[in-house]
Amino acid sequence: MSIQLGIGGFKPFPVKFVDENKYGDCKALTNYMRNLLKVAGIKSYPALINSGYRSFPADPSFPLDVFDHVILCIPREKDSVWLECTSDHNTAGFLGSFTENKNALLLTENGGVLVPTPRSNYKNNQLSTKTDIILDAEGGAHAVSSIYATGDIDGLFYEVNKEDTDTQKEIYVHYFNYKEPDEFVLKEKEQTGIGTTYHFELSYDKIYDFNAGNKYFLPQRIYQLSNEKINPSYSRRNEYLFRYPYEKTDTTIFHLPEKFSTDNIPSPVELNNDIGYYKKQIVINKEARSLTIITQLNLKKSIISANDYSKIAEFYASVQKNEDQKIVVLSNDRAVAQN
């Protein structure tokens, strides 16, 4: 929603308007919060800003009206607190990729002041997934999964959680790159610290990618940990932008049925440079007939210089090569017809 009023469209509606109508755009809601804080004796300033992770910060050396959004700044002695007043979910002080790492124009009693907004690091955007996959003797499976998400990643799952079940399933498959389930049930969600934990269950008539006789070739997890497609041969002159830095961790536990055993497993690996980190560990418990894969993927920064483009392309190519390895399990009591 955008309600235009005043020169340049930046004059907010009065507090009374928001209070009575229970809605407002970024200007009106920011002004409403500013006045609430004022009553509590807390000083704050509206801040004009240009939004979107692909839009570059306002240039202090070249005056130009590039602003299309308003947020609120609460100045403090050591650091400022920034509020995105249009969000009912963002953690206080977290801006995210929409307005982070920009130059905001504070509207103070002494005039306009251009100040930088904070930049998130990969610890601010976490995705931690744990999945138990119970295989049956026919190659099907039931998966019980929980996701803990913070920052921008939490914002994505929060919006998806508002949709109906069919739409959620479609988004999980086509956007989050989950293997398409035959049944999908989103369970309860719960606020956990600064993030949210989401619980869901999935059922598959066929969890394996393909089979050869009594050998099943399984994916390492029910979704792709990385879907970055970066052309390593491309010559780049400008910076390469990711939406945000992140830390992804995944623990997937395969529970094998009786008379099943592991035939081949992916190799452990660790990759590290100043841009990314990737590590994979495998634990086999023969007594419990389980195979656990623990994986971590960090993107340490979201703005990649042109000089580092080949480095990040090669890093993600190596990650994908490792992610494409299959788990091979063997059915020891019968041969499975080849598909």
Model-derived features with residue positions:
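A sensor for short, sequence-defined functional sites
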Residues: 1-339
